Amino acid sequence: DDFQLIPMISKCRTKEGRRKTNLYGFIIKGRSHLRNDTDVVNFVSMEFSLTDPRLEPHKWEKYCVLEIGDMLLRTAVGQVSRPMFLYVRTNGTSKIKMKWGMEMRRCLLQSLQQIESMIEAESSVKEKDMTKEFFENKSETWPIGESPKGVEEGSIGKVCRTLLAKSVFNSLYASPQLEGFSAESRKLLLIAQALRDNLEPGPSILEGYMKQLRSA
C-alpha cells in the first residue's frame, strides 16, 4: 500500500497480426495526497536500454546506470548479443501535468476513433475490409476542412494529423487553466486578421495586448 509499481509499456501488433506488449521499464511511486495543481509527486524511474552510458557520459550524470545482463538481437546475419543497461533516476511531476498528460492521451484515442469510423464507413460501402487500401492508396484524397478557397482535401496522413491537432487544440482551449491565455490568443487572431485586411491596430492596442498575454 505504501508504494506503486507502474510499468512503462506500449501495445502493438506484429506483422503476423498477433498482439504484442513492449516493456520499457518501471516507475516506483510512493503515497501522495495532491491537493493543488502545483503539488509535486516524486517517483523513481527505471528504464531498460541498449545505450552504453560510457559513450556519452555527460548525458547521464543524473542517472544511476547498472549493467544487468545481455540481450539477443535478431539481425540480417543472425543473432548478436548486446549488453543491457538499467537507467535509474529520481524525478517528479505536478498534478496538473499528469492531468494534461491524460487529456492528451484521450486526444490521440479520439482522433483514432474518427479514423476508424471513416474506415468502417468505406468498408461498408465497398462490402469488404478497406483498412489496408485506406492507408496504402496514395492517390485518393479526403476532405480536411473548409477555407476561403472551398473544401480542402489531402492525403490520409494529412487527415490523421489534422484530426489530432484539432483534438489537442480543443482540449487546450477548453481547459480552465488556460482560459486567460485562450482569450488573449483569440485577440491575436483578430489582430492578424486586421493586418491581412490592411486595418492597422493602434500601438496602444498592441502594447496592452502584449502586457495581458504575458500576465496570462
UniProtKB/Swiss-Prot annotation:
Keywords: Phosphoprotein. Coiled coil: none annotated. InterPro entries: PA/PA-X (IPR001009). Belongs to the influenza viruses PA family. One of its GO terms (biological process) is viral RNA genome replication. This is Polymerase acidic protein. The gene is PA. GO terms for molecular function: RNA binding.
